[in-house]
Amino acid sequence: MDSIRGPPTDTLYLSMQDPASKPELSNPEPAPKSFLHHATTVAALTAASRLTGLARDAVLAAAFGLGLVADAFFLGFLIPNLFRRLFGEGALTAAFIPNYTNLKQADPAAAARFAKLCVAGLAAVTGVLVILGELAVFLLMQHDGWSEKGQLALLYTAVMLPYLPLVCGVAFLAAVLQVHGRFGPGAAAPVLLNLAMIAAATLGIATSRDQPHAATLIAVAVVLAGLGQLAWLFFTTRKHLTAGGPGFADTKAPLKKTALMLGPMLLGLAVFQLNALFDALLAFFLAPPSPDQTTTTLAGYTFEAPVQTGAVAALQWAQRLYQFPLGVFGIALATAIFPALAAAAAKKPTLSERGSSPQSPTFLTTLHQGLRLTAFIAVPASVGLLLVREPLTAVIYQRGQFTDADTARVAAIVAGYALAVWAYAFMHLLTRAFYALHDAKTPLRVSLAAVALNLTLNLLLIWPLGTPGLALSTAIAAVFQAFLLLYFLHRKLEGPVLPHDVRFSLAKTCLASAMIAVPVGLLPTALQMQGLESSWLILAAQVVAGLIAFPSAATLLRMPELTWLLKRHLPKTV
């Protein structure tokens, strides 16, 4: 349910402005820091957000377990969440940032007017979508054939749809701040949502043991939290939106470029979001209507259900666990590097800099370092999550209505997702590289191919594997998509996306990750042989072993990425 400045001689300390090209502003912004500095800032704030998110999920799991109310609530929250990713954190911000960056360099006042127009357009579009969505829900509610789970899902959808324009506005305003070198407010805003949901769930459980009533209180809290998030981001962004003055004639060109990029991006991201939508819909409609049944009826046909009641909730809670390392590290790095890539792509190489690639050396260096850091973080995260999935699931969720059997179900799904945490991280970075080059069509075509593969695998694997088959399908499609993006980016740049130093770094990262598998993987068995079966103890021991083993392996292999991260500083050349 849920949402990243250094001496000018450093090629990675990318300035968003060229002081020689325009008069000095009365209130100049500080010199920009490296994307790695921003990435660590965002990672820290995202970690706080994800930790409060895990606390929220622990409360929800204790209240609802893997039951029909949890399924209905998460399906109801799916629509606004999908549109948040589509408009707020996806297509609009990806189309907006490169054009806003260019306009800000040339004319800050025009950039402010451009941002205001985009905000107004986003509000209008999402407002219309809410009205249409509420009308559709009302019409669906008139049908008498819904089960209790279906009726609750429609109710929660109706309550939470107004969150859609609020959270999209929050994500867009965060994008404005990113271009101005402020990554903190956007990364920290989800904490408000998490705290509001925790408070509502606690209140609902304390005042009523009726699960549907408690879920309704949480749904209302989601909308109220969205209002708070938007108010905070607007207050933080207002000086960048009010500096432009009247008149919009000088924004026509960037608006046109944004609109031309937005179409393919919307299609590409909409196609990609279909993966999450179809996963949830399959889990919802192919599950029995209540826990005491084993069959389900669809389109008039009754058959043995391939998944159990609570499949939607199980998917959501498993996704939270793999999204924690992905959001804290992978997406944080991709978010921070995007403005740097956009600025580098806008800077054409000089005659002396031109080589085999039409892009500036700064763009290629930034991309290569991003790839190395992404792998250095995400590959061991994949291995670690796979190894700690069972004690982690038990520690986070197993209490109240969430049983041992529920832990086993969610952990099995986490295993499928964990196989491709590194691929998800690469997808975010590589897609942003294409967007920085004003190419939205290639990611669209790649997304179409990946979705087709994912849907095919969903229908094939859900029957023998159940809900874990949906996670495994997503992981396989993500690996396929990451390799396709690498291939097409290599062709587009007319130069090596994975030069020798990057390939050598990737190989050493994989070796270091394999080296942590032995101590981390053997610890549970060793502790259990000593009669120590506490999930908390096993998880703590595995985490400590991993935190010691991987840096030790990286040091033994002389990997500079560890130093980059610890010092929050990148070298001038790789």
Where are the regions that the model predicts?
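N-terminal amphipathic/hydrophobic targeting modules at extreme N-termini
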Residues: 1-5, 9, 24, 354
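Membrane-embedded alpha-helical bundles of multi-pass transporters/translocases
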Residues: 13-574
